[in-house]
């Protein structure tokens, strides 16, 4: 029999490799009323496992010293350890983890009773949220445990993190697929039942539904299968229906029981759908323009004669007045001048449709020649390799 219902390590070798790569490793095991210990040097046991006392405790202490013969650097980065241990505490509600760095007399205690709901709260700190955190746990018939927490905020990015047996999957997998399917179905059903889609005359996609969403998906699977040794994508087919069914049931009930939250989420989705459509139209307009169109506009781009981007320079100047002075003093062969009027938009905080509808930003995009958007952006088409 296995010692644990579920378990997980990065490569499935755990302490064996730690032992092999350590100059010294010391084990202390508290079990069945006795204290056992064993020590290894460079992977070789120094003596058999022995009993050194009695105890009422249970657990294992592992101490190891990385080998300087193997590693060029043996100094631990406390920030990396803190990030991972905090993550583990969120994923295992009620487990208390203490991190001490005796080099600088530092101690962190991680103890989150709320589990994934506190994980979402931590990620969304400082953001304006649209709903209270939705959080549930469920057990499927095949031994798979599902836990999900989510919340929408007023940002425009999706932030979904997936875990299997406490191991992160940056490429998602079947648990993410099940989550997305249930989320989209639940929201579409709500929008149809409330007659919102007909009223607003918009078509909604899964991307619209996930704009501003922060979510954590954690599954515990007895025998998980991954796409590679590093476990960056879960491929266990039985996980998708387990997550989808649990999420569908719980999330649909949440929307019915929390009408104000559902209304806020629906408003966010409709705004995202409209913005996506406006961005598409604006992108098509920008695509139809060329640098020659802009060159013909008064007070806009004064291009250089050089056609080789590596030898061309673009100077961005504020206003037509500065633009006129710059044009008089430039080297026409290799220096282009682009005057920009008014207060430029902070594109980091602006929604995509607002950014692309800005005349000054549109002028800049067209002048640079790289295009815009995931499908069309190509840095190889940059018309100037020096931009000032």
Curated annotation (Swiss-Prot):
Its top-level enzyme class, in one word, is: isomerase
- Entry EC number(s): 5.6.2.2
Keyword vocabulary terms for this entry: ATP-binding, Cytoplasm, DNA-binding, Isomerase, Nucleotide-binding, Topoisomerase
Per the record, GO CC terms? Answer: cytoplasm
State a single Pfam family of this protein.
Toprim
Reactions catalysed, as given in the entry: ATP-dependent breakage, passage and rejoining of double-stranded DNA
UniProt GO MF annotations: ATP binding; DNA binding; DNA topoisomerase type II (double strand cut, ATP-hydrolyzing) activity
Which GO annotations describe the biological process of this protein? DNA topological change
InterPro entries documented for this protein: HATPase_C_sf, Ribosomal_Su5_D2-typ_SF, Ribsml_uS5_D2-typ_fold_subgr, Topo_IIA, Topo_IIA-like_dom_sf, Topo_IIA_B, Topo_IIA_B_C, Topo_IIA_bsu_dom2
Please state every residue range assigned to the domain named Toprim.
312-388
PANTHER family assigned to the protein according to its UniProt record, in alphabetical order: DNA GYRASE SUBUNIT B, MITOCHONDRIAL, DNA GYRASE/TOPOISOMERASE SUBUNIT B
Family per record: Belongs to the type II topoisomerase GyrB family.
Q: What else is known?
A: Few gyrases are as efficient as E.coli at forming negative supercoils. Not all organisms have 2 type II topoisomerases; in organisms with a single type II topoisomerase this enzyme also has to decatenate newly replicated chromosomes.
Partners and quaternary state?
Heterotetramer, composed of two GyrA and two GyrB chains. In the heterotetramer, GyrA contains the active site tyrosine that forms a transient covalent intermediate with DNA, while GyrB binds cofactors and catalyzes ATP hydrolysis.
Its biological purpose: A type II topoisomerase that negatively supercoils closed circular double-stranded (ds) DNA in an ATP-dependent manner to modulate DNA topology and maintain chromosomes in an underwound state. Negative supercoiling favors strand separation, and DNA replication, transcription, recombination and repair, all of which involve strand separation. Also able to catalyze the interconversion of other topological isomers of dsDNA rings, including catenanes and knotted rings. Type II topoisomerases break and join 2 DNA strands simultaneously in an ATP-dependent manner.
Q: What is this protein called?
A: DNA gyrase subunit B
* Taxonomic lineage: Bacteria, Pseudomonadati, Pseudomonadota, Gammaproteobacteria, Moraxellales
């Amino acid at each position: 029999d296995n010692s644990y219902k579920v378990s997980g390590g990065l490569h499935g070798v755990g302490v064996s490799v730690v032992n092999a790569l350590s100059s010294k490793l010391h084990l202390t095991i508290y079990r069945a009323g006795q204290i056992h210990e064993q020590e290894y040097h460079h992977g070789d046991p120094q003596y058999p496992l022995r009993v050194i006392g009695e105890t009422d405790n249970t657990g294992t202490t592992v101490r190891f010293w990385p080998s300087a013969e193997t590693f060029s650097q043996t100094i631990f980065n406390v920030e990396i350890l803190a990030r991972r241990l905090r993550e583990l505490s969120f994923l295992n509600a009620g487990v208390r983890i203490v991190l001490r760095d005796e080099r600088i007399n530092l101690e962190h205690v991680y103890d989150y009773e709320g589990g994934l709901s506190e994980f979402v709260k931590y990620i969304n700190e400082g953001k304006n949220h649209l709903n209270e955190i939705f959080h549930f746990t469920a057990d499927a018939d095949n031994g798979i445990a599902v836990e999900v927490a989510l919340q929408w905020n007023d940002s425009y990015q999706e932030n979904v993190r997936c875990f299997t047996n406490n191991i992160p999957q940056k490429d998602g997998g079947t648990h993410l697929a099940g989550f997305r399917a249930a989320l989209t179905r639940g929201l579409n059903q709500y929008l149809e039942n409330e007659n919102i889609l007909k009223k607003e005359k918009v078509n909604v996609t899964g991307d619209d539904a996930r704009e501003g969403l922060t979510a954590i998906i954690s599954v515990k699977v007895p025998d998980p299968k991954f796409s590679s040794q590093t476990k960056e994508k879960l491929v266990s087919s039985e996980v998708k229906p387990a997550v989808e069914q649990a999420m569908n049931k719980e999330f649909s009930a949440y929307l019915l029981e929390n009408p104000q939250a559902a209304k806020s989420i629906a408003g966010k989705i409709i705004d995202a759908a409209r913005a996506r459509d406006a961005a598409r139209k604006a992108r098509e307009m920008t695509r139809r323009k060329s640098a020659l169109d802009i060159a013909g506009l008064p007070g806009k781009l004064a291009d250089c004669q050089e056609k080789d981007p590596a030898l061309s320079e673009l100077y961005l100047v504020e206003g037509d007045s500065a633009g006129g002075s710059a044009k008089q003093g430039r080297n026409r062969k290799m220096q282009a001048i682009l005057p920009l009027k008014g207060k430029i938009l902070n594109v980091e905080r602006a929604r995509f449709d607002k950014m692309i509808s800005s005349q000054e930003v549109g002028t800049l995009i067209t002048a640079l020649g790289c295009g815009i958007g995931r499908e069309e952006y190509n840095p190889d088409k940059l018309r100037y390799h020096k931009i000032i």
